[in-house]
Amino acid sequence: MTLWDLTQGASAKVSRFKADIENGYRTRLSELGFHPGEQIACVLSPRMGAPKLYLVNNTVYSLDDSIASLIEVA
């Protein structure tokens, strides 16, 4: 399952990044707290494919499907 698959109110731990993620994205996401073992919650999942809001370390980030689908969670 990917981060994009999380529904509003659900949470999961990051398990890994997909192999095809660009190094720049991997580095920046890790700096923001999206790293393996980190608990992440989906706080808002708007309709029509709009970016979702995720809570990581008391900070809320907006990610669209092209990025959130590269982060695998369990």
Q: Which residues make up each language-model segment?
A:
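C-terminal structural segments of small proteins and small subunits
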Residues: 12, 46-74
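A structural micro-motif recognizing beta-strand termini
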Residues: 17-20
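Short alpha-helix capping/helix-loop boundary micro-motifs
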Residues: 23-28
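Structural motif
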Residues: 38-39, 59
